[in-house]
Amino acid sequence: KYKLAAGKTAKSILISCGARLAPFDIQEVRDVTAYDELQLDTLGDKKTALFLIMSDTDATFNFLISMIYTQLFNLLCEKADDVYGGRLPVHVRCLIDEAANIGQIPNLEKLVATIRSREISACLVLQAQSQLKAIYKDNADTIIGNMDSRIFLGGSEPTTLKELNQALGKETIDTYNTSNTRGNSPSYGMNYQKLGKDLATVDELSVLDGSKCILQLRGVRPFKSDKYDLTQHPNYKYTSDCDKK
């Protein structure tokens, strides 16, 4: 098909291809992608930890992370169906921190809905929901809708706060109004009524205590909870935060 293209069209194809593949001109990138040493299809066979670490200030090579996740989901889904009868023997949990900075994972809106049945889950960590919408456009709502749980750790991004405020709904409060008139004909009155009030206003959410979080689980009303104190974890002593050596 390339050879059938007109001269100018063929040149445009070459220029576009060269621009997209430019990172592979770097020898280190070619070395990393020359052969497979990750064995992604084995992650669901036994307990394994795989760390994918990229620069949080330079997005040049973030596409590599996106490629890895795409291959990971495809390989594990195929293995779950073809080898294990639909479910991996060991649950694979993907903790995708700074999910907005790794580039777009193709068909993520479909994957998050289908990988769960194969014992695979994805946890997207974002600074704000608007980041997800900036990358996945209209599919962002589908991705969020397919998440069984959502945790708000705090923030001040207006769109996120407004959507959380609406999701929390309202509570019913009792109000009592009293009136007292003094003078020649004193009188006293009391009025009682029920009113609807936002469970948490946008204002209140923006100043959420740093030690608190709001958890939304499917089928359960949202609730406020304490954040887990990592320093109390039995393995905290093995982390670099505890031991600077």
Task: Annotate each language-model stretch with its function.
Residues 1-120, 135, 203-227, 231-245:
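P-loop NTPase motor domains
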Residues 47-48, 110-113, 131-245:
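P-loop NTPase motor core of the ASCE superfamily
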Residues 126:
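H-loop/switch region of ABC-family ATPase nucleotide-binding domains
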